Design a protein with these regions (language model features):
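Conserved, well-structured core segments that form or line functional sites
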Residues: 1-194
Length: 194
């Protein structure tokens, strides 16, 4: 995960994001390249909010948006340089009943995790999880907020390879750097947000 977010993003496709008994396969992501990317939270430098984005890689960066939704990112790139990959959609794999309970508005299982806020609701990911190490035992955490998280969020590799030719296009829901084709997805997967 030490590579650029544009390299790490498609590599994350088909990895599994899990929390307790709930898990989903990552089917859509977006890359954000720190100081080089006007759409990145870290574009203007280090702040208390963006500190986790500066590394080391493999940690979870969770932020609150629109005053109501959490969004989850995987920190990547060299330690000390801000970069992250937004997880945009998951294909539900395990704990689907619990996901349905957390997302009662979802009419179909493909609606449970087909957006960044939806997947955070389905897996109960909040700001308390920001700073959690996605790859290590639960004790390894960065930042103060993660200390309150009871069940760690983790990244799993079940042996499913990333797609050879992922879908690729511009990022969604941003107003700057809109021309960059840094959104990647598993082509044909019905859980992709759009």
């Amino acid at each position: 995960m030490e590579g650029s977010p544009v390299v790490v993003a498609p590599w994350l496709l088909n990895k599994v994001l899990a929390r307790g008994a709930r898990a989903g396969r990552i089917v859509e992501v977006e890359a954000y390249d720190g100081a080089k990317d006007a759409a990145s939270h870290a574009y203007r430098g280090l702040t208390p909010r963006t500190a986790i984005m500066f590394g080391p890689p493999g940690f979870l960066y969770v932020y609150f948006t629109y005053g109501m939704h959490w969004c989850a990112n995987v920190v990547c790139g060299p330690d000390g340089e801000a970069a992250a990959v937004l997880i945009r959609a998951l294909e539900p794999l395990r704990g689907i009943e619990a996901m349905r309970a957390s997302r009662p508005a979802a009419r179909r299982d493909t609606d449970l995790c087909n957006g960044p806020a939806k997947l955070c609701q389905a897996l109960d990911i909040t700001g308390a999880d920001s700073g959690g190490d996605l790859m290590a035992p639960p004790a390894r955490r960065r930042g103060g907020a993660a200390a309150g998280a009871s069940v760690p969020v983790r990244l799993e590799d079940d042996g499913t390879a990333p797609p050879r030719r992922p879908g690729r296009g511009v990022r969604i829901g941003i107003t700057v750097a809109t021309e960059l084709p840094w959104r990647f997805w598993v082509a044909g997967n019905p859980n992709v947000s759009r």
